[in-house]
Each structure stands twice: as structure tokens, then as C-alpha cells.
């Protein structure tokens, strides 16, 4: 499956929620959408990992010139390796972990009379309790794709902004494009 659409999000998260006020880390996150599969990943981390691998192949372990940032702890792939399955890849220190599970769709409550505009699209608000957090998502029915960042899927339009009730995680769309050259 090749990606046809790319949504770029500003991702913000708290590394240590016990420290107040919160200290946020941010990064450019991407959601690539294909016919069947989607991927959600930290763009800076992807570039950094690729450069590190290339340098390591040549025996060059000087990583001082690598881009800064790119610390979102995981990448998520829906309907990969097969329909109905997902993979979450997570790096902890120098160890990589892979978790394969069934795709779950959150049970969303649509909030009437809610409205905002995100990257030029009229959006409505929804709420769910999912994976131990209360999540809010602004979705655009004008973009009829039930996709969103991470596992926040299943709304009647593309999720352009999502955040948890405690404001420990947030993803806000800052751009959207159609990919002319399919991206695996």
C-alpha cells in the first residue's frame, strides 16, 4: 500500500507529567494515509534514524551534525502488516520494541454545537475515553476519511486536532497534501 495523503501535525507531549508546570517537547508528526494502511510517525526522528543508519554503515559514529528533536517515543502503523492489525514501534534508550495488536476504534461522543476552523476546514468536536485517557478531537466532515493521529480513528471525518484532557499530549494539523509520487 502506498500513501496518497499526508497530514502534518505539530505534536506536543510531556515527558514527565509529575513535574509542574509541564515541560513540553514538540516535533513534526506525520500521518500518511494509503488505500488500506496508515502510518503515524515523528518526521525528525525518521530523518535522524535514516542518517544514523547510513553513517553507521560507513563506520562513522559522529552524530553531532544530526538534526535536533525527533524524540516522539513511537511510530504507529494501522492495517499493517494486515488488515485489522496494527504495529506500534517504540524506542526506549537503545532498545526497540514492537507491539502488534488488533485495531481498535474508540467509542466517540459527538459534541453538538461545537465549531472551530483548523487549516481552513470547519471542524466539530468529539470526546472519548480510550486507552486510559479522556481524548478530545476536532474532525472535518469535509474530509471524509475516518483517520487521525495515533489510534484516534473512526470519526466521520479526518481528525485535525486531538488532545487529552490533562493536556499531556496534543496533535494539531498544520498542513495537508496529496502525494503525487506514492510513498511506501
Question: Can you say where each PLM-predicted feature lies in the sequence?
Answer:
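Extracellular or lumenal secretory-pathway regions
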Residues: 1-116, 122, 135-136, 167-184
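Structural motif
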Residues: 118-119, 130
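Gly/Pro-enriched, hydrophobic low-complexity segments
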Residues: 124-183
Amino acid at each position: 500500500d502506498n500513501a496518497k495523503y499526508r497530514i502534518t501535525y505539530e505534536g506536543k507531549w510531556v515527558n514527565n507529567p509529575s513535574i509542574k508546570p509541564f515541560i513540553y517537547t514538540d516535533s513534526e508528526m506525520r500521518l500518511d494515509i494509503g488505500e488500506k494502511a496508515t502510518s503515524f510517525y515523528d518526521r525528525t526522528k525518521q530523518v535522524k534514524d535514516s542518517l544514523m543508519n547510513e553513517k553507521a554503515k560507513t563506520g562513522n559514529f559522529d552524530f553531532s551534525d544530526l538534526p535536533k528533536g525527533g524524540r516522539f517515543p513511537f511510530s504507529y502503523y494501522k492495517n499493517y502488516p494486515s488488515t485489522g492489525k496494527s504495529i506500534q514501534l517504540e524506542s526506549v534508550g537503545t532498545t526497540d520494541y514492537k507491539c502488534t495488536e488488533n485495531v481498535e476504534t474508540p467509542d466517540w461522543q459527538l459534541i453538538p454545537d461545537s465549531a472551530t476552523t483548523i487549516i481552513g476546514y470547519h471542524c466539530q468536536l468529539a470526546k472519548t475515553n480510550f486507552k486510559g485517557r479522556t481524548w478530545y478531537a476536532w474532525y472535518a466532515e469535509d474530509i471524509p476519511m475516518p483517520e487521525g493521529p495515533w489510534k484516534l480513528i473512526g470519526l466521520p471525518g479526518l481528525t485535525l486536532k486531538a488532545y487529552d484532557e490533562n493536556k499531556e499530549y496534543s496533535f494539531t494539523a498544520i498542513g495537508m497534501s496529496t502525494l503525487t509520487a506514492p510513498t511506501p
